[in-house]
Amino acid sequence: SWANLNTFGR
């Protein structure tokens, strides 16, 4: 999920 990528704070 894109939300998982959002965890990186990008």
From Swiss-Prot:
In the record, what terms sit under GO molecular function?
D-mannose binding
Q: Subcellular location, in the record's words?
A: Secreted
Q: Which UniProt keywords apply?
A: Calcium, Hemagglutinin, Immunity, Innate immunity, Lectin, Mannose-binding, Secreted
User: What domain of life?
Assistant: Eukaryota
UniProt keyword Repeat, yes or no: no
Keyword Repressor set for record: no
- Give the record's subunit note: Forms an oligomeric complex with the C-type lectin 35 kDa subunit.
What is the protein named?
A: C-type lectin 65 kDa subunit
- Species this chain originates from: Petromyzon marinus (Sea lamprey)
